[in-house]
Amino acid sequence: MKYKLALVMSVLCAFSAWTEAKVKLPAILSDGMVLQRERPVKIWGNADKGENVTVVFKKKKFSTVAGEDGKWLVELPPMKAGGPFEMTVNDIRLKDILVGDVWLCSGQSNMELTAGRVTDKFAEEIARDENPMIRYVKIPLGNDLHGPKDDLPGADWMPLTKETAPSFSALAYFFAKEMYRETQVPVGIVNSSWGGSSVEAWMSEEALQKFPRQLHERDLFDSDEYRELCNRSGQMMNRFWDTALYKGDRGLHDGICWNRPELDDTDWQTVDMFSKEWGRKNGYPVSGSHWFRQKVNVSAEQAGKEAVLRLGCMVDADSVFVNGIFVGNTFYQYPPRIYRVPASILKPGENLVTVRLINYGGAASFVPDKPYCLAWGIDTVRLSSRWKYQLGCEMPARTNSV
């Protein structure tokens, strides 16, 4: 009995050791990835120290041993474009691998902007795209001042399809298609971008040595407690600002709400939305809330259908109402304003569109050369650039501590 128990325990211990020694790969080395052609390619990961690791790719084996820190790496020789192929790393099997050209795309919001945000101009092209030879991976957002990460969970490769195309970086989407047309080899896009990020945030500690002020900031943010304090402080300041704006907005609390059709706005100023004749005091931009009202004529046939209200882009945030009913909002300046208007809201004849525009600092504005209209497919009613205008609440510029 003791012999059997010892045998069972030995088997369990061996199984436990085998499972613990399992090789691990970073998320970006996964199904559907693209490897760079005609260059040596590194495959890496983690395992228990001393673990034997064998990579098999295109019928060739490459072996190594995990080091004292558990890390291992093998280098594949230069390869011609092609695929799809399979790869095994010990007991891990990766499928649908291509060899072609891999491009790193990086930057701020212009690179991060998705193809789904440019469907106004490229709807048909994006809706019909299918090319399994183009692959895309977006590096998840995150920061860590304690050193580079070994892995980035969530960095998953996707092929170009009509379902995935809207998730691609718009710039990278058109670039990848052009490169494939020129080369006819698989294209892999690695998008590592973060809107509004500073170049210093992407620099290593070594690279910052020549910039004492930025290096000092980096040293400050090396403290988890300091970063948390800054984040809490910024969030608290924003809450105070938002609360003060809400309480001080005459359009929300001064009798009839300014989004209501029954409000008498005859004493409101009439302004051109693209001019500088509104939103200023003594020649300087006014932060806070700005209210705009415009009446739009809709036919009986149009009123019986759901519409899309397009309001270009605005600086900074907005809430939009049709006939006093909320239809949508956006919290920052860059996205196109595209709001669905149910058929039940619209009526034949005059319909009131109201915009409550919030400006955090600098000049509030509507971006010109964008669509401003009610649309039912190709049937549209353009909005005038002339609106009734009233300042709701003047505020100091909103600032963040970080």
Stretches with model-predicted labels:
Residues 44, 268, 296-324, 353:
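Aromatic-lined ligand-binding clefts that engage carbohydrates, nucleic acids, or primary amines
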Residues 27-31, 286-299, 337:
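Short beta-strands within extracellular/lumenal beta-sheet-rich domains
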Residues 281-291, 328-334:
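Extracellular beta-rich ligand/substrate-recognition surface
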Residues 92-159, 192-277, 345-402:
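An acidic-aromatic loop/edge-strand motif
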Residues 22, 28-101:
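Ser/Thr-rich low-complexity repeats and stalk/linker segments
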Residues 1-22:
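Bacterial Sec-dependent N-terminal signal peptides
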Residues 59-82, 313, 321-371:
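Beta-strand-rich ligand-recognition modules
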Residues 152-191, 196-198, 302, 307, ...:
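A conserved hydrophobic secondary-structure block that centers on an alpha-helix together
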